[in-house]
Swiss-Prot record:
Residues 178-190 have a biased composition (Polar residues). The small GTPases Rab are key regulators of intracellular membrane trafficking, from the formation of transport vesicles to their fusion with membranes. Rabs cycle between an inactive GDP-bound form and an active GTP-bound form that is able to recruit to membranes different sets of downstream effectors directly responsible for vesicle formation, movement, tethering and fusion. RAB13 is involved in endocytic recycling and regulates the transport to the plasma membrane of transmembrane proteins like the tight junction protein OCLN/occludin. It is a lipid-anchor. It is an enzyme of class 3 (hydrolase). This is Ras-related protein Rab-13. The gene is Rab13. Residues 174-202 are annotated as: Disordered. Keywords: Cell junction, Cell membrane, Cell projection, Cytoplasmic vesicle, Endosome, Golgi apparatus, GTP-binding, Hydrolase, Isopeptide bond, Lipoprotein, Magnesium, Membrane, Metal-binding, Methylation, Nucleotide-binding, Phosphoprotein, Prenylation, Protein transport, Tight junction, Transport, Ubl conjugation. Ubiquitinated via 'Lys-11'-linked ubiquitination on Lys-46 and Lys-58; impairing the recruitment of guanosine diphosphate (GDP) dissociation inhibitor 1/GDI1. It comes from Mus musculus (Mouse). One of its GO terms (molecular function) is GTP binding. Gene3D superfamilies: P-loop containing nucleotide triphosphate hydrolases.
Length: 202
């Protein structure tokens, strides 16, 4: 019996507590949103299989607690992660400032060359914005990683962001059969044309 997928990629979401990591995962895996999630205790993961470049990719997306007291738990889960998504809240400047600390944590604990992605979540709350888009774009350029503004609540750019990271991992692992290795700006998930008014990819 043939496998139901061609590749299995482990992804990890990290960032401060309250930035919306769990909501992003639920939106991506189940296309659902619930604003009343309690703060994640320990680690949980969701699975979704997507089609990218003609390949069936099984994405195992791990949620982590942002609180420092759980750091010993999350450190172990960096190992084996092929992609890491750094999440901050556009309405919380401190969560953006702490991205540098999370970058350092990746460097100390993750595999060398792991694919990274920066997400500014809650872009539906424009009136409460504390982190300007240009600030995040600059940080992403400095670290040579992709950047999206997302909204788990409005489903803005969520599929696009996960698909982008999965595609980059596929390219790096040689899963693509033809074409160049330049990072494409388009994504491979078949999704409806969701709202993209204020939260465009960088």
């Amino acid at each position: 019996m043939a496998k139901a997928y061609d590749h299995l990629f482990k992804l990890l979401l990290i960032g401060d507590s309250g930035v919306g990591k769990t909501c992003l995962i639920i939106r991506f895996a189940e296309d659902n949103f619930n604003s009343t999630y309690i703060s994640t205790i320990g680690i949980d993961f969701k699975i979704r299989t997507v089609d990218i470049e003609g390949k069936r990719i099984k994405l195992q997306v791990w949620d982590t607690a942002g609180q420092e007291r759980f750091k010993t738990i999350t450190t172990a889960y960096y190992r084996g992660a092929m992609g890491i998504i750094l999440v901050y809240d556009i309405t919380d400047e401190k969560s953006f400032e702490n991205i540098q600390n999370w970058m350092k944590s990746i460097k100390e604990n993750a595999s060398a060359g792991v694919e990274r992605l920066l997400l500014g979540n809650k872009c539906d709350m424009e009136a409460k914005r504390q982190v300007q888009r240009e600030q995040a774009e600059k940080l992403a350029r400095e670290h040579r990683i992709r950047f999206f503004e997302t909204s788990a609540k409005s489903s803005v750019n969520v599929d696009e962001a996960f698909s982008s990271l999965a595609r980059d991992i596929l390219l790096k692992t040689g899963g693509r059969r033809s074409g160049t290795n330049s990072k494409p700006s388009s994504t491979g998930l078949k999704t409806s044309d969701k709202k993209k008014n204020k939260c465009l990819l960088g």
